[in-house]
């Protein structure tokens, strides 16, 4: 149970998550990190089985590094999404319990956002929410999203969306993590109030 949000705008991609880690209705951790940096230009959110996601995202991180070494450029995000889709599809009937948002900026497609589910289904989205709090977050996204919004407005909308989920979903809480990915790279927004963006 969790809430993860992704928003793609012209300038880049915003990923936001809550920090509560649960096992059923047991709160296992209050400072969980649910955004996984795959490379400087791409990251993923974690919703579902933690061990399954860590395994898959570790593989994608390794594959991205191998690609960069071999081809001297960052891996296209669509290639990463295709890898994870094939792994999930061909793991049947022993499915990975995962639901992830993969987003970033590459030279092939610009700012892109994909949703991948446990069966290997891939959809390209402008905005998306996953996890138990997603109905509440998606409502805020539907009302607030505009195609011409700035990156700063997208950060504000992502924060509002996760806050809406935290207010209504017992599986979400303990704070919000926000990441921004632009052509300059991966940046973590440390405090929503100050809008301080620090390069990682």
UniProtKB/Swiss-Prot annotation:
The active site is at 2 (nucleophile). It is found in: Cytoplasm. It catalyses: Cleavage of peptide bonds with very broad specificity. GO terms for cellular component: cytoplasm; proteasome core complex, beta-subunit complex. It is an enzyme of class 3 (hydrolase). It comes from the Archaea. The formation of the proteasomal ATPase PAN-20S proteasome complex, via the docking of the C-termini of PAN into the intersubunit pockets in the alpha-rings, triggers opening of the gate for substrate entry. Interconversion between the open-gate and close-gate conformations leads to a dynamic regulation of the 20S proteasome proteolysis activity. Its EC number is 3.4.25.1. InterPro entries: Ntn_hydrolases_N, Pept_T1A_Psome_bsu_arc, Pept_T1A_subB, Proteasome_bsu_CS, Proteasome_sua/b, Proteasome_suB-type. Residues 1 form a propeptide. Gene3D superfamilies: Glutamine Phosphoribosylpyrophosphate, subunit 1, domain 1. Keywords: Autocatalytic cleavage, Cytoplasm, Hydrolase, Protease, Proteasome, Threonine protease, Zymogen. GO terms for biological process: proteasomal protein catabolic process. GO terms for molecular function: threonine-type endopeptidase activity. It holds the Pfam family Proteasome. Belongs to the peptidase T1B family. The 20S proteasome core is composed of 14 alpha and 14 beta subunits that assemble into four stacked heptameric rings, resulting in a barrel-shaped structure. The two inner rings, each composed of seven catalytic beta subunits, are sandwiched by two outer rings, each composed of seven alpha subunits. The catalytic chamber with the active sites is on the inside of the barrel. Has a gated structure, the ends of the cylinder being occluded by the N-termini of the alpha-subunits. Is capped at one or both ends by the proteasome regulatory ATPase, PAN. Component of the proteasome core, a large protease complex with broad specificity involved in protein degradation. This is Proteasome subunit beta 2. It comes from Pyrobaculum islandicum (strain DSM 4184 / JCM 9189 / GEO3). The lineage of its organism: Archaea, Thermoproteota, Thermoprotei, Thermoproteales, Thermoproteaceae.
């Amino acid at each position: 149970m969790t809430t993860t949000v992704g928003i793609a705008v012209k300038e880049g991609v915003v990923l936001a998550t809550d920090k509560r880690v649960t096992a059923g209705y047991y709160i296992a951790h209050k400072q969980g990190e649910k955004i996984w940096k795959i490379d400087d230009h791409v990251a993923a959110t974690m919703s579902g089985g933690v061990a399954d996601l860590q395994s898959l995202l570790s593989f994608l991180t390794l594959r991205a590094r191998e690609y960069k070494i071999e081809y001297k450029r960052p891996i296209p995000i669509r290639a990463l999404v295709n890898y994870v889709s094939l792994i999930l599809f061909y793991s049947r009937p022993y499915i990975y319990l995962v639901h992830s948002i993969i987003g970033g900026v590459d030279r092939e497609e610009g700012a892109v956002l994909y949703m991948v589910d446990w069966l290997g289904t891939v959809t390209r989205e402008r905005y998306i929410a996953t996890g138990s709090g997603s109905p509440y977050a998606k409502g805020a996204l539907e009302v607030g999203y505009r195609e011409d919004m700035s990156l700063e407005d997208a950060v504000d909308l992502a924060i509002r969306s996760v806050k809406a989920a935290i207010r209504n979903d017992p599986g979400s809480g303990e704070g919000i993590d926000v990441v921004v990915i632009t052509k300059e790279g991966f940046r973590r927004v440390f405090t929503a109030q100050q809008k301080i963006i620090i390069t990682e």
